[in-house]
């Protein structure tokens, strides 16, 4: 079994996250995807509670499952002492799936901070790493020069920051997030300007 591990704050999950999961299915190819909701120790919290982020990640997993891929959500990292670290998540996943081929899915923006992550070499020992880079961006020498990293060109002109900004200014989120996530954001009153 090939298991893709997709960690992030998912504050909120958006159509770019959905597309990354579908790309992982086709290009890795991954049989299953594990969506791990976490805090980012390198960034400040943005607004949704842990419970709300888990709820929205569950809605994202339902969208992924509708495409025929098996997706599940874990809040394991949120239950750990803060900050939690990717290497610890991968150790946990490896203990639960000792025979699985693991691939960590990382966006290019997150990978830029990879040298600051806890135990990067341990991460490489536990899993392959697939970096999704935005099309049209200059290729980073750091990524291009690392044979342990698989780069996947990816075009998703949406980010969680954009979704939060649109929500705060009352702009429509249609086309930026799955419909169910949009309804959740609206019903919970998330990301409104204070």
Swiss-Prot record:
Pfam families in alphabetical order: CTP_transf_like
Keyword Transferase among record annotations: yes
Pathway participation: Cofactor biosynthesis; NAD(+) biosynthesis; deamido-NAD(+) from nicotinate D-ribonucleotide: step 1/1
TM region positions: none
BP terms from Gene Ontology: NAD biosynthetic process
Molecular function GO terms recorded: ATP binding; nicotinate-nucleotide adenylyltransferase activity
Protein keywords: ATP-binding, NAD, Nucleotide-binding, Nucleotidyltransferase, Pyridine nucleotide biosynthesis, Transferase
Record EC number: 2.7.7.18
Catalytic activity: nicotinate beta-D-ribonucleotide + ATP + H(+) = deamido-NAD(+) + diphosphate
Known function: Catalyzes the reversible adenylation of nicotinate mononucleotide (NaMN) to nicotinic acid adenine dinucleotide (NaAD).
HAMAP family for this protein: NaMN_adenylyltr
NCBIfam families: cyt_tran_rel (TIGR00125), nicotinate (nicotinamide) nucleotide adenylyltransferase (TIGR00482)
Family in the record: Belongs to the NadD family.
The name this protein goes by in its record: Probable nicotinate-nucleotide adenylyltransferase
């Amino acid at each position: 079994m090939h298991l893709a591990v997709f960690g992030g704050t998912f504050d909120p999950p958006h159509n770019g996250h959905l597309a990354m999961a579908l790309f992982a299915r086709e290009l890795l190819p991954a049989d299953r995807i594990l969506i791990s909701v976490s805090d980012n120790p390198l960034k400040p919290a943005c607004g949704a509670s842990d419970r709300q982020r888990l709820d929205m990640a569950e809605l994202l997993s339902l969208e992924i499952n509708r495409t025929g891929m098996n997706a599940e959500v874990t809040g394991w990292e949120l239950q750990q002492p803060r900050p939690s670290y990717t290497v610890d998540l991968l150790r946990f996943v490896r203990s639960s799936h000792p025979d699985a081929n693991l691939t960590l899915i990382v966006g290019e923006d997150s990978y830029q901070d990879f040298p600051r992550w806890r135990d990067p070499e341990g991460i490489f020992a536990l899993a392959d790493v697939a970096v999704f880079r935005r099309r049209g961006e200059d290729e980073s020498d750091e990524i291009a020069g690392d044979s342990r990293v698989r780069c996947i060109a990816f075009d998703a002109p949406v980010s969680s920051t954009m979704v939060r900004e649109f929500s705060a200014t009352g702009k429509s989120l249609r086309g930026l997030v799955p419909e169910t996530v949009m309804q959740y954001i609206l019903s919970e009153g998330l990301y409104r300007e204070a």
